[in-house]
Swiss-Prot record:
SUPFAM superfamilies: YbjQ-like. This is UPF0145 protein Csac_0771. It comes from Caldicellulosiruptor saccharolyticus (strain ATCC 43494 / DSM 8903 / Tp8T 6331). Belongs to the UPF0145 family. PANTHER family: UPF0145 PROTEIN YBJQ. HAMAP family: UPF0145 (MF_00338). Coiled coil: none annotated. InterPro entries: UPF0145_dom_sf, UPF0145_YbjQ-like. It comes from the Bacteria.
Length: 106
C-alpha cells in the first residue's frame, strides 16, 4: 500500500475515493523510562527512551491506518497527517494520531 503526505501520487491516477481514515495509538511511559529521560534532560541531549516510544507509536498508527484503508478497498492513502500529543496529569502518556484519505490508484 502506498502511503504519502502529498495529495496525489506522481505517476498514479486516483480513480476512487474511499473516505477518510484515521488511527490513534496511546502509549504509557513508565517510571523507569521517565527517570532515564529526566537524567538525559538534566545533562542535555536527546532522550532515546522517548524517541523510541514515539517511533513505535507512529509505526503502529500508520500500520493501523493502512489496515483500515485496506478494509475499505483502498490501495493507497494520500494526504497523511501525523500529530503527537502528551497526555495524562504528569505527561505519562504519548498519543500519535494519523489521518488521511483512502483511495484507489492505477
Amino acid at each position: 500500500m502506498i502511503v504519502t503526505t502529498t495529495p496525489s501520487i506522481e505517476g498514479k491516477k486516483i480513480v476512487d475515493y474511499k473516505g477518510i481514515v484515521s488511527s490513534e495509538v496511546i502509549v504509557g511511559v513508565n517510571l523507569v523510562k521517565d527517570f532515564i529521560a529526566s537524567i538525559t534532560d538534566i545533562f542535555g541531549g536527546r532522550s532515546g527512551t522517548y524517541e523510541n516510544e514515539l517511533i513505535r507509536a507512529r509505526e503502529e498508527a500508520l500500520q493501523e491506518l493502512q489496515n483500515r484503508a485496506a478494509m475499505l478497498g483502498a490501495n493507497a492513502v494520500v494526504g497523511i497527517d501525523i500529530d503527537y500529543e502528551v497526555l495524562g496529569t504528569n505527561g505519562s502518556m504519548l498519543m500519535v494520531s494519523v489521518t488521511g484519505t483512502a483511495v484507489v490508484v492505477e
